[in-house]
A protein has these predicted regions:
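Short, low-complexity Ser/Thr-rich regulatory SLiMs
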Residues: 39-41, 151
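Short, linear, compositionally biased motifs with a strong N-terminal bias
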Residues: 10-13
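Active/ligand-binding-proximal structured segments within catalytic/core domains
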Residues: 32, 41-92
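Boundary at the C-terminal end of the N-terminal hydrophobic targeting segment
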Residues: 19-21
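Bacterial N-terminal signal peptides that target proteins for export
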Residues: 1-8
Length: 253
């Protein structure tokens, strides 16, 4: 079956766990994908989780926050989910990628601002031929609940619950999500991530935690904040985000 052969995700398909480890089934597909199943026939809903063994520790030193930012844009669809006309949208998407590289390389603030305006115009054009929330809508339409994700130092995971009879549809949508993602609304999502960073700076627990990490693991990637440094968040490269995805979001990982 094409779906199973090409599935690039680590799926923990569980309903609930009566006793930790009881009834656990684990196996590995030919492409290296590890699959874990816990079964509880007393429940009607399934809890599906896709985990990737990567996080802030794998962020490039000059582009911190990538793992977390990637988590955000993994909800924006694929070349089939979320597009009204991919033939029209794709060249605009490629222009946006190139413009972010151009803006990151530009030192002149005035020229940088001008490139930002070009990106804004291209984003508006792309928005006319895309529906960035279609992935989330599809999950909800099949009875999916609590669609969410989280990024840690070594792990990023995506999860939601759904009716058991929808498992084939969930697998199909999830596999497409991880095989052919399109990182739409990069511009507006960056603002969301930066606002999350600002809220963290107002949170004493977050500030203390980041301080302890920076001292306890000084000189090591564990010293970084998952959210990244503000100077990196303000000067993003979509091409680096795509590279991070290609490097780490693989079946065996």
């Amino acid at each position: 079956m094409k779906l199973i052969k090409s599935l690039i995700l680590l799926a923990a398909i569980a309903v609930s766990v009566p006793s930790f480890g009881q009834g656990l089934k684990a196996f590995k597909l030919k492409n290296g994908l590890s699959v874990y199943i816990w079964e509880d026939n007393t429940k009607s809903d399934v809890f599906g989780l896709v985990g990737v063994r990567t996080g802030a520790v794998n962020d490039p030193a000059e582009y911190t926050g990538l793992a977390h930012y990637l988590e955000h844009v993994m909800f924006k669809g694929t070349d089939k989910i979320g597009t009204l006309d991919w033939t029209t949208e794709e060249p605009i998407y490629q222009q946006i990628i190139a413009k972010y590289d151009e803006m990151a390389d530009e030192a002149d603030p005035v020229k940088k601002e001008a490139i930002g305006k070009e990106i804004n115009e291209l984003t508006i054009q792309a928005g006319k031929v895309s529906v960035s929330n279609e992935f989330s809508n599809l999950m909800e339409s099949m009875g999916g609940k609590n669609l969410n994700a989280a990024t840690g130092m070594d792990l990023t995971y995506y999860h939601n619950s759904f009716p058991a009879f929808q498992i084939n549809k969930w697998l199909e949508i999830s596999s497409q999500r991880f095989l052919n993602p399109v990182f739409r609304t990069f511009q507006s999502e960056l603002e969301t991530v930066y606002e999350e960073y600002n809220r963290g700076q107002d949170n004493p627990w977050r500030v203390q935690y980041d301080f302890i990490q920076s001292k306890a693991y000084e000189g090591h990637p564990y010293s970084r904040s998952v959210l990244g440094l503000p100077e990196h968040l303000k000067n993003p490269r979509l091409s680096q985000l795509i590279k991070f995805y290609n490097d780490w979001y693989t079946a065996e990982n």
